[in-house]
Amino acid sequence: MTPHEAFAEGRLAEAVALQEAAVADRPDDPAARLFLVELLAFAGELRGAADHLRQIDSDDPNWPASARSFRRLLRAEWRRSFADRRPVVLPGPAPRHARRRWPAIKALRDGRPEDAVRYTDAADAVTPEVSGFVDGRPFDGLRDADDRFASVLEVFFAGRYAWVPFEHLRRVTLRPALGPLDAAYRPARVRLATGDEFDGHVPLVYPGSHEADGVFAVGLETDRVCPDDGPIRCVGGKLLLVGDEGDEVPLAECRMIEVR
């Protein structure tokens, strides 16, 4: 089995081991080392990914810009998954529901699930309902399946980790996936209610999914978990609940979300 085949089947640990062997055999092959960088990012091994990224020497004139983009993605993911920092909220100031979700995440990290439930319940109580279109299909009601992020869209831009409250989003256009890492961080164009627009990446896999089975780590499947009577959390691919019935729509399958 090749590393690409193992990755496609969600066998992430096997794919990493196979690709590490390939890089050991061909240490000067930039494509081989870049694929290892991508696999290590899925596996949550951000430091190792950054180390291998620095070792890539490519004659491609576009490589410096590509390397800079990879570094920014790794930096944003570190801030999302490992740094104890409140995300940027766009546009500011943060609405009450967004301000209450961050303490819930902090409470979960500190082992206080009951406090986390209180925070997410308080956030839900002041979250406005939004309506709009997902790929042209109208909806009334939109939320993330994970209580930690129920009312916000996670976005990476310029190495920063941000939340966009759904009521402050006007449109997000997810571009087609061109490489393996696009399955985790999809290039996107974001338009805010203020009229401001920017290019960034939308994470398609929940933070911490690298600790689960391979199919979840690479976003092929999603599972909702509540191991400690805390808020509902998800592992695997990002999942939206759309409309009054809460229809499950994988974010990776969306091309455009518009909010009225």
Predicted regions and their residues:
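Inward-facing hydrophobic residues that define packing positions of alpha-helical scaffold repeats
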Residues: Q19, L53, Y119-D121
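TPR alpha-solenoid repeat register
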Residues: A32, S66-A67
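Residue at a conserved register position within TPR or TPR-like alpha-solenoid repeats
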Residues: A6, L40, L74-R75, A107
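Short coil turns that delineate tetratricopeptide repeat
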Residues: P27, P61-N62, P128
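Structural register within alpha-helical repeat arrays
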Residues: T2, F35-L36, R71, P103
